[in-house]
């Protein structure tokens, strides 16, 4: 404890004025012991010799304390206190009575003797009695102070005040006949308690030991001090610490006082338990927040628990864990923090071994047995981890310290996350040692898994290390088996290899990869001179059988290794160009193709990749050409390269003569014959298949096995073929000065090159025919659209089109199809225009359908629906009063190919809107005295009513409705009776009125029609 704080606490507790430095943050509180402290200052100093005849049950009080550091020196008795100290309560009571009686008697006797009067004697008795009473009062008033001094001196005699018992304190109180609640006695108890608490708390630079709470609680119970009084002493200590903190000017001193205060808060919280929340008002008195109190409790609890953990080593047992759990609960440490601290402690224990192992592993002067030392340290780690794992599954694990379980170096403030490479070295060392015997035991496999978790390695990282080390061990054992002949002598080599993998816990697929790698290395050694001899083939076969390598793996290895050599030869041959592919180059190709023992398919696949790469370069340059002629020239170079280089190289690879013509596929020949019969009129297509004389003149044809079919999209291949076809058809265009140009026609040999181009591009016969037909149709269509500009097909135009067809060479069916499409398109445009302009009705539509004109394709659905709506509108405005449901709902929608339900909705909407309009129109015509128009409008009203039956209609002037009915019923020709009755119902006219209107003369109509303009 800070010495200055001890000095301050050793001073008597008195209500001294507050320091100005503390008053601004400490609230004004009434001092708890002001009265008793005032009494302590009114002690009298009276010299009385100490009697040596004290009773045997009296507690002796020495003049010098044995332990002045805590409670100071013994206090001396002054004034009446030595006399009071000698008296027991009965003696003190008797003495008080004697003194009082003697005083009264003495006063009475003196007054009577001196004055001779009884009144004066009574007065003297009263005065003497008062004096005696004062003596008695002083004597009794000194008792609590004497008891307090006796208690102080008694406690000061002990070297360890904790030895004081509750019985000792009660004996002192009983001896003097005082109550423990007496202010002076209670003040002394509080002072003793305050001094003891101060002495128990750690001094400057020290930490809590963990026994402070037990000592304070024991001493508090021994003194019998009340909880509120004890809490007040803790608050007083806190005030003094705060005061000293304000008086301290140094930063270090301030920090130390802050730590001292946090220790006080923590110890106080444990001493008073749950009652500390209201017994210790830190926030109200010292402005300390609840969060700061929680931090003080948490940090000190962590410090104490950490100190307890230091006592636990790697030989931890059940008793240690139970004690740690009890300590955690007594320290008020949360389970989460306790778990973190325990894991950190176990991590530190393991780190010692890990660090030792790393230092050995990285030592430059490490001995040959360094690996064994490293493994020994790691075994200690695993042993400690297994101990914790077993304790975690203990039957009484719920009573153990929190955090018992497997260890991991990763987490919290550990720096091993940045030293992952070092941990990998340790793991590798352990795996290497586990496989040092040539096999991997089950217990080692489990230990490797645990070590991986402890070191915090990822599953992939650990697996990579294990596979690497196991692969080396597998290679070593495999080499021994091969060199010793054990593997070759086995009847079942697969079982032997499988057993080897099981002993090492090695994956069979990874073992197969090692076998493949060994085979590849052997193969590379055999082909160093560019070919495989018979001895090499035999050695490779022997190795393949011993290692059980599948044929597919062997073929893949040969294709890659031998193929790489062959590919280089092919590239050199191709790079020599058209002129450089001589006999020497052909010889090297033949040697590589057959000496490397490549299959024909593999060799052709390798050559195909290289050739197609060159073809692609030609195609790229052809696309980048400025015009069609330059593009065709690049394509011609590609055709020449295919004929002079690729064709020869393919023959060399196959071992055939290049002069031998390739065999034609009979199915393909049949397809070409069928196409010749169908499209023989196409001159451009016919020229691509020349006669024998021209074929012999052009020389041997090019190969068609290596094509660009899978390298270019269909659209690009067709465009390239079409480009060269147009070049063959139009010829070469040469520009001359003054803006003129000369077109040079090409001979039929260009069409043979076109045929070879089709083979290089991988176009089928059908695709080639479609290209030729498409160009012919395009040429014919362009000319035919000019001839049929107005869509009219006359006899002269037919003859003109026939002549054009012969020139183009387009077959008759195709020509007729083009002509029909042109005329149909022209007609569709004309029909659509007529519909939009309203010049086409349903009658004309039916005539067109009878003429086999497809209206569905010529007229859009929206236009057909528009035409239907116009037709229905004409019916509702025709003035006939007729509405044929079959015609409107079925026949017309069928003729126009529209939806029937949708047609019905259109009819209903029109009928409902035209119903009221027809009535308004009829009234308007009535006012204009247009009787004929009135009849027509009423017929339209009846037609709408037939489509959608209506309710009786209302009108403001009922006489006008009567006039409408009268005019309609008397119209000429006379309407049908059912129409008259329906109109009567719609106009809301009763039978009597209807009869009167029919019998009324024409001139007797109401004048409502004449006045209608004003009414309206």
From Swiss-Prot:
One of its GO terms (cellular component) is TOC-TIC supercomplex I. Its main location: plastid. One of its GO terms (biological process) is chloroplast organization. It is a multi-pass membrane protein. Residues 1-51 form a transit peptide. The keyword Protein transport applies. Keywords: Acetylation, Chloroplast, Membrane, Plastid, Plastid inner membrane, Protein transport, Transit peptide, Transmembrane, Transmembrane helix, Transport. The keyword Nucleotide-binding does not apply. Residues 117-118, 281-368, 651-719 are chloroplast intermembrane. Residues 670-680 have a biased composition (Acidic residues). Disruption phenotype: Embryo lethal. Expressed in seedlings, flowers, leaves, stems and roots. Residues 52-95, 140-259, 387-632, 737-1016 are stromal. It comes from the Eukaryota. The modification N-acetylserine is found at residue 52. The chain crosses the membrane at residues 96-116, 119-139, 260-280, 369-386, 633-650, 720-736. Residues 654-708 are annotated as: Disordered. It is found in: Plastid, Chloroplast inner membrane. Belongs to the chloroplast envelope anion channel-forming Tic110 (TC 1.A.18) family. Involved in protein precursor import into chloroplasts. Forms a voltage-dependent cation-selective channel at the inner envelope of chloroplasts, which specifically responds to a transit peptide. Associates with both the precursor and mature forms of the preprotein. The region 143-1016 is indicated to be located in the stroma while the homologous region in pea TIC110 contains probably 4 trans-membrane domains resulting in 2 regions in the intermembrane space localized to form supercomplexes with the TOC machinery and to receive the transit peptide of preproteins. An internal domain (143-652) is sufficient for assembly into supercomplex with Toc complex. Part of the Tic complex. Interacts with HSP70, HSP93 and TIC40. Interacts with the Toc complex components TOC33, TOC75 and TOC159. Interacts with LTD. This is Protein TIC110, chloroplastic. It comes from Arabidopsis thaliana. The lineage of its organism: Eukaryota, Viridiplantae, Streptophyta, Embryophyta, Tracheophyta.
């Amino acid at each position: 404890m800070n010495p200055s704080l001890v000095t301050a606490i050793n001073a008597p507790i008195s209500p001294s004025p507050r320091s100005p430095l503390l008053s601004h943050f400490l609230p004004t509180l009434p001092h708890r012991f002001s009265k008793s402290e005032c009494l302590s200052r009114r002690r009298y100093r009276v010299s009385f010799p100490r009697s040596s005849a004290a009773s045997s049950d009296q507690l002796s009080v020495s003049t010098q304390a044995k332990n002045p550091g805590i409670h100071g020196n013994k206090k001396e008795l002054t004034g009446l206190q030595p006399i009071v100290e000698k008296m027991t309560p009965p003696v003190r009571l008797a003495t008080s009575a004697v003194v009082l009686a003697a005083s009264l008697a003495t006063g009475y006797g003196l007054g009577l003797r001196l004055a001779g009067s009884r009144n004066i004697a009574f007065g003297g008795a009263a005065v003497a009695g008062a004096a005696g009473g004062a003596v008695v009062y002083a004597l009794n008033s000194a008792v609590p102070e004497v008891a307090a001094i006796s208690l102080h001196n008694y406690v000061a005699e002990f070297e360890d005040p904790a030895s004081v018992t509750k019985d000792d304190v009660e004996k002192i109180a009983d001896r003097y006949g005082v109550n423990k609640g007496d202010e002076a006695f209670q003040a002394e108890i509080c002072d003793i308690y305050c001094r003891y608490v101060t002495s128990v708390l750690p001094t400057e630079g020290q930490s809590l030991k963990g026994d402070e709470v037990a000592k304070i609680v024991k001493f508090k119970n021994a003194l019998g001090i009340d909880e509120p009084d004890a809490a007040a002493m803790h608050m007083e200590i806190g005030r003094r610490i705060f005061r000293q903190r304000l008086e301290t000017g140094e930063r270090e001193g301030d920090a130390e006082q802050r730590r001292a205060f946090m220790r006080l808060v923590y110890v106080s919280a444990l001493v008073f338990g749950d009652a500390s929340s209201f017994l210790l008002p830190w926030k109200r008195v010292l402005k300390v927040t609840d969060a700061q109190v929680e931090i003080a409790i948490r940090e000190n609890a962590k410090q104490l628990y950490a100190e307890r953990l230091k006592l636990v080593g790697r030989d931890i047992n059940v008793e240690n864990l139970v004690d740690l759990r009890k300590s955690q609960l007594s320290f008020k440490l949360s389970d989460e923090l306790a778990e973190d601290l325990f894991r950190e402690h176990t991590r530190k224990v393991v780190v010692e071994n890990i660090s030792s192992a790393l230092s050995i592993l990285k030592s430059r002067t490490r001995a040959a047995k360094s690996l064994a030392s490293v493994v020994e340290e790691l075994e200690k780690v695993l042993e400690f981890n297994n101990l914790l794992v077993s304790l975690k599954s203990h039957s009484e694990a719920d009573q153990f310290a929190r955090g018992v379980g497997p260890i991991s170096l990763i987490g919290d403030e550990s720096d091993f996350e940045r030293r992952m490479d070092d941990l990998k070295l340790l793991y590798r060392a352990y795996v290497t040692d586990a496989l040092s015997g040539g096999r991997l035991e089950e217990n080692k496999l489990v230990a490797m898994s645990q070590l991986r978790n402890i070191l915090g390695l990822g599953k992939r990282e650990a697996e990579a290390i294990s596979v690497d080390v196991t692969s080396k061990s597998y290679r070593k054992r495999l080499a021994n088996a091969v060199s010793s002949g054990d593997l070759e002598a086995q009847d079942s080599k697969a079982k032997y290899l499988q057993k080897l993998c099981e002993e090492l816990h090695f994956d069979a697929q990874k073992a197969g990869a090692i076998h493949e790698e060994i085979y590849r290395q052997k193969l590379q050694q055999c082909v160093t001179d560019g070919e495989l001899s018979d001895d090499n083939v035999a050695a490779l076969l022997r190795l393949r059988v011993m290692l059980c390598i599948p044929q597919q793996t062997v073929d893949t290895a040969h294709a890659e290794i031998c193929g790489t050599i062959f590919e280089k030869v092919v590239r050199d041959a191709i790079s020599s160009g058209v002129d450089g592919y001589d006999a020497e180059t052909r010889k090297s190709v033949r040697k590589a193709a057959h000496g490397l023992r490549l299959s024909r398919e593999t060799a052709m696949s390798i050559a195909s990749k290289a050739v197609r790469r060159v073809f692609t370069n030609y195609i790229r340059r052809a696309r980048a050409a400025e015009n069609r002629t330059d593009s065709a020239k690049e394509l011609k170079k590609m055709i020449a390269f295919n004929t002079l280089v690729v064709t020869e190289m393919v023959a060399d690879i196959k071992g055939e003569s290049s002069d031998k013509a390739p065999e034609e596929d009979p199915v393909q020949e049949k397809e070409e014959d069928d196409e010749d019969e169908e499209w023989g009129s196409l001159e451009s297509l016919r020229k691509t298949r020349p006669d024998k004389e021209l074929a012999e003149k052009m020389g041997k044809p090019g190969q068609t096995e290596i094509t660009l079919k899978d390298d270019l999209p269909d659209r690009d291949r067709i465009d390239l073929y079409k480009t060269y076809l147009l070049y063959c058809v139009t010829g070469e265009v040469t520009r001359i000065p003054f803006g003129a140009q000369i077109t040079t026609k090409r001979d039929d040999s260009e069409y043979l090159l076109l045929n070879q181009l089709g083979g290089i591009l991988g176009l089928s016969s059908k695709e080639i025919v479609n290209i030729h037909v498409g160009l012919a149709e395009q040429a014919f269509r362009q000319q035919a659209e000019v001839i049929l500009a107005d869509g009219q097909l006359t006899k002269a135009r037919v003859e003109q089109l026939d002549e054009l067809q012969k020139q183009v060479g387009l077959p008759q069916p195709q020509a007729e199809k083009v002509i029909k499409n042109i005329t149909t398109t022209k007609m569709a445009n004309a029909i659509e225009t007529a519909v939009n302009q309203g010049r086409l009705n349903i009658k004309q539509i039916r005539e067109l359908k009878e003429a086999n004109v497809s209206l569905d394709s010529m007229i859009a659905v929206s236009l057909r629906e528009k035409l239907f709506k116009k037709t229905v509108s004409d019916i509702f405005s025709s003035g006939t009063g007729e509405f044929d449901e079959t015609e409107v709902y079925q026949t017309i929608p069928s003729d126009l190919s529209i939806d029937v339900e949708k047609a019905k909705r259109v009819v209903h909407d029109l009928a409902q809107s035209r119903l009221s309009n027809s009535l308004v129109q009829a009234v308007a015509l009535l006012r204009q005295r247009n009787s004929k128009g009135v009849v027509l409008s009423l017929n339209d009203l009846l037609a709408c009513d037939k489509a959608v039956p209506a309710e009786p209609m209302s009108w403001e002037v009922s006489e006008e409705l009567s006039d409408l009915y009268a005019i309609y019923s008397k119209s000429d020709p006379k309407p049908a009776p059912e129409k008259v009755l329906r109109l009567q119902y719609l106009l809301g006219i009763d039978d009597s009125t209807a009869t009167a209107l029919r019998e009324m003369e024409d001139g007797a109509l109401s004048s409502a029609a004449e006045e209608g303009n004003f009414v309206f």
